[in-house]
């Protein structure tokens, strides 16, 4: 635990790119000290959000989406957001699944948010849940409690890997965001401030909110009499959002580099590619 006062650690950025081969295999304890821009907050009285790209630290920290979400959640004074990454072989070795910033167990968070970019990471989602001791299926979590009587974390997902087709992972998540999340996250935080005591009420409200797919409340079968289409979210004005690096680390594909999004999507329109569905200048 940190001191009662909020501690925000922003190290002086060393912007020189590290020479030589990047380290793909650093574990959580090795990677954290090398970071610049880490945000560490006291846990007292805050909404605790775990943020995960279900892949290695090296891959996850190469993602601007993860960095944008990290900054957006932590921008709220009554919210803390800490990162959790998948580590090859960690589950099989019986290692506990802990957050990077405060070494907190995944099950201790109020919300566990996943940003998923690739279909192959679906398998890592299930492995992470099992490693954390959390029932993988949403129905199992709804029907049970943790050993101390607390509810399980609310599990949500977003990203292109689920926007294209959420159904492969629908049984594992309480709610899935379809589309772009910049404008959806602040509203989600507002709902969590008032609704975490009763997850059923919170999920019902999300089900009525554009962009959110709550699998157990919305049949996926188009022939079902209660089928309702999910409205996909698009950011109305990308320049309103600073999609650039928040964290710097030598242990990523773009070692200690500042990244900026200058456009989103692709205008070529190849039918086999999901990137064709959006082209927006930043």
Q: PLM features: residue spans?
A:
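Core AdoMet radical
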Residues: 50-59, 80-89, 110-122, 136, ...
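Glycine-rich beta-alpha loop elements in corrinoid/cobalamin-binding modules
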Residues: 86-224
